[in-house]
């Protein structure tokens, strides 16, 4: 009998492999993305100190709950880029957390790039 692999287990395996190769600093923090069925979360992390420098999610009050999930992801990317600009962060390392680079992950990344983050 053919068994179907668990998608989340494969994602976590990819995430561990990615995290072994990338790390964020205060000058160039890691932009980590988490995607659930309803929401999307993004944060800028300094791995040297182990602190979150900035964050944004669809649960924030300033991000509209209207529109599609793709539009909401783009709003999160824009909000995170604006917060980063206020803290003089221009360049980041993108951590897609094992998710494939398309859909909501790509929309968030593109919006962050359009609003001033470099990666």
Swiss-Prot record:
GO terms for cellular component: cytosolic large ribosomal subunit. GO terms for biological process: translation. Keywords: Ribonucleoprotein, Ribosomal protein, RNA-binding, rRNA-binding. CDD domains: Ribosomal_L18_L5e. The keyword Ribosomal protein applies. GO terms for molecular function: 5S rRNA binding; structural constituent of ribosome. It holds the Pfam family Ribosomal_L18p. This is one of the proteins that bind and probably mediate the attachment of the 5S RNA into the large ribosomal subunit, where it forms part of the central protuberance. NCBIfam families: L18_bact. Part of the 50S ribosomal subunit; part of the 5S rRNA/L5/L18/L25 subcomplex. Contacts the 5S and 23S rRNAs. PANTHER family: 39S RIBOSOMAL PROTEIN L18, MITOCHONDRIAL, LARGE RIBOSOMAL SUBUNIT PROTEIN UL18M. Belongs to the universal ribosomal protein uL18 family. This is Large ribosomal subunit protein uL18. It comes from Lactobacillus johnsonii (strain CNCM I-12250 / La1 / NCC 533). The lineage of its organism: Bacteria, Bacillati, Bacillota, Bacilli, Lactobacillales. The gene is rplR.
